[in-house]
Amino acid sequence: MQIGAQFYTIRDFTKDLDGLSESLKKVADIGYKTVQISGTCDFDAEWMKEELRKNGLKCVITHTAPAKITGETEKVIADHKTFGCDRIGIGFYDVAKNGVQAFIDYYKDAAEKIKQAGLRLSYHNHDAEFVKIDGKLIMDHIIDAFAPDELCITLDTYWVQSGGGDPIWWLNRLKGRTPCVHFKDMAFTGKERHMAVVGEGNMNFDGIIKASVDNGVEYALVEQDNCYGEDPFDCLKRSYEYLKAQGLE
């Protein structure tokens, strides 16, 4: 299992191409070989291909705007193939508000086209997916509505726990369907929970790492939505060093 950097962590530094280019270099200098491109400025696919090449990086998944996934599916597929990325990610969809059927209707055709092109659509959870609709968790509704080769899950460990779920149980439940997982820790100050550098919070990352390996996770993508005034690159570095010490590459 390889350690990766989720660029949403450093989104404030990637608002233009110069910042994105510099951020790719800084992440590579930390030691990362794998990235998820998310929350950045727009870029040309050929430009990204070259930036990844010169920094020795591979993009294994993106978060792509929903309107592009469904309205410009062929272009999104072509762009991902250009810079060598096999997975097109959905960062957020308000299933609790819009309903499960609306989610299915919105993404089903795109999921099929992406599958036929040899890529995979992937859904990233937050905590709302652990609300029940008609006696069934939203996450289960989503999983059951799509075949594994139509939709994989970018399981976010922090948001699973925030929603009252057990990340290890869900890694077991989704065996073979979670090639990419977001590693994000949770800590508490008093009664207030907050996101933390991996290994510096309270989550059972020994167990999460073991379950990830046992269930075929390929990429552990470090994400920290909020660094609370700390340098996000330093947070990425500390998470990387912790995971390296646990035997990840």
Residue ranges of each PLM-predicted region?
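Conserved, mostly hydrophobic/aromatic
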Residues: 5, 27, 35, 52, ...
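C-terminal helical cap(s) of enzyme catalytic domains, especially alpha/beta-barrels
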Residues: 230-249
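Structural motif
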Residues: 29-30, 83, 117, 176, ...
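Alpha-helix-loop-beta-strand connector modules within alpha/beta enzyme cores
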Residues: 48-64, 110-114, 140-148, 205
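Acidic/histidine-rich catalytic cores of soluble enzymes
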Residues: 116-202
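N-terminal pre-domain/capping segments
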Residues: 1-86, 248-249
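Hydrophobic faces of well-ordered beta-strands that scaffold small-molecule active sites
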Residues: 3-7, 35-37, 59-64, 88-90, ...
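Acidic-and-aromatic substrate-binding clefts and catalytic sites of carbohydrate-active enzymes
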Residues: 11-17, 34-47, 64-73, 93-101, ...
